[in-house]
């Protein structure tokens, strides 16, 4: 991409607060964006070949939405935790295996999407994200849903297409959790904690494509209670 084209993009972004440059084969985060740290509210650099984010990413104090899906990121800099106004962070289709501890400082974050990365463990340190509504960890290699999931404020957690064979009982204590997606994992019927059915807020539990027939769920203790929540939610949105 030529300098003049980039310059035109930057000039437009200065006015709009939006910088979108997708599918251009970029191998580096555009350094010229440093000039717009005071302006930018939305950045989308999806479908490029960017391997790392610069430390100056932390200086975009007004950034609300950052999408950098389908690149080649293997890690994130600690400075990403400085984005105090960030509400949406989309990192799908990279090569991330873990998150920096500073991610827990993103106090405004509502959506964190990490689908299609290389996580083998459920990322830790997300319990401090008090505004988090949606956490997408689908298409990774996670095997266990650990007890610390109970610390999350998320309303929806998507764990479809992992390698999960174990789900903690504590998941029922996740205070705002309404939607739990566990499709296409390695779960036996006996691995589903009954407390999700009997004692949680979950009104949509999707478990298709595991090692049991979904209709066998009907025989589990607490299934009727779960169905009451499921039906009530459906009526609300009908």
UniProtKB/Swiss-Prot annotation:
The keyword Repeat applies. Coiled coil: none annotated. It holds the Pfam family LRR_14. LRR repeats lie at residues 10-36, 37-62, 64-82, 83-106, 108-128, 129-152, 154-173, 174-199. This is Leucine-rich repeat-containing protein 57. PANTHER family: LEUCINE-RICH REPEAT-CONTAINING PROTEIN 57 (PTHR48051:SF62), PTHR48051. Signal peptide: none annotated. SUPFAM superfamilies: L domain-like. Keywords: Leucine-rich repeat, Repeat. The keyword Transferase does not apply. Transmembrane segments: none annotated. The gene is lrrc57.
């Amino acid at each position: 991409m030529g300098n003049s084209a980039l310059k035109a993009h930057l000039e437009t972004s200065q006015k709009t607060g939006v910088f979108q440059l997708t599918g251009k084969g970029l191998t580096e985060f555009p350094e010229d964006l440093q000039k717009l740290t005071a302006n930018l509210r939305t950045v989308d650099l999806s479908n490029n070949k960017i391997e790392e984010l610069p430390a100056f990413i932390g200086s975009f104090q007004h950034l609300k939405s950052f999408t950098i899906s389908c690149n080649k990121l293997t890690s994130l800099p600690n400075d990403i935790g400085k984005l105090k106004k960030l509400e949406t962070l989309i990192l799908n289709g990279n090569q991330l295996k873990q998150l920096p501890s500073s991610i827990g400082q993103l106090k405004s974050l509502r959506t964190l999407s990490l689908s299609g990365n290389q996580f083998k463990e459920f990322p830790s340190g997300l319990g401090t994200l008090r505004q988090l509504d949606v956490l997408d960890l689908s298409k990774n290699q996670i095997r266990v849903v650990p007890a610390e999931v109970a610390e999350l404020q998320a309303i929806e957690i998507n764990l479809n297409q992992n390698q999960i064979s174990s789900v903690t009982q504590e998941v029922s204590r996740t205070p705002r959790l309404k939607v739990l997606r566990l499709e296409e994992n390695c779960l036996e019927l006996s691995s589903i904690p009954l407390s999700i059915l009997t004692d949680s807020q979950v009104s949509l539990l999707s478990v298709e494509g595991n090692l049991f027939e979904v209709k066998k769920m009907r025989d589990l203790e607490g299934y009727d209670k779960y169905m009451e929540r499921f039906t009530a939610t459906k009526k609300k949105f009908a």
